[in-house]
Amino acid sequence: MRQLSRRAALAVGAGAVTLSVVGWSQGAHAAAKEAADEVAKFTGGKAATQGKITIELPEIAENGNTVPLTVSVDAPMTAENYVSDVLVVSEGNPNPGVVTFHFTPLSGKAEAQTRIRLAATQNIVVVAKTSKGEFYTALKQVKVTIGGCGG
């Protein structure tokens, strides 16, 4: 049996690390594309304007199994103009659609709280739709130390 030299062993190890990083990177890009597709389906391909949305998430989530999330939209809630739906999408989970909240003018305020599961460090994208067909968006990154979706 032939032994590997130290140089050859290091080269093989570096190659394995490179392949695993490339594989992870391709998976991350695929998840981000799926998230973008989910947003495009929600908006019907219309552009969303930055602003009006506040996302409250911890900067670092020690456990991805239960991450507190509060979403609020600074918009009128009148019969003529109100936030009707808010979509929350994760760019790093196996299934990007996290939750969709539905509101009416009787809601009084477009705000919701929940707990979400996150597989790894990732961006959370929130898109709000108004009754007039306008869309607003915001993004926030969360660092996850222990994944909650099998990660």
Question: Which functions belong to the PLM regions below?
Answer:
Residues 1-20:
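N-terminal secretory signal peptides and thylakoid transit peptides that target proteins
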Residues 23-54:
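C-terminal segment of N-terminal export signals and the immediately downstream linker at the start
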Residues 68-76:
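Short edge beta-strand/loop segments characteristic of extracellular beta-sandwich folds
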Residues 85-89:
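Beta-strand signatures of extracellular beta-sandwich domains
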Residues 94-117:
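An anionic, turn-rich surface loop/hairpin at beta-sheet edges
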Residues 119-123:
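Extracellular Ig-like/FN3 beta-sandwich strand-entry sites
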Residues 131-137:
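Short acidic/polar inter-strand loop motif in beta-rich domains
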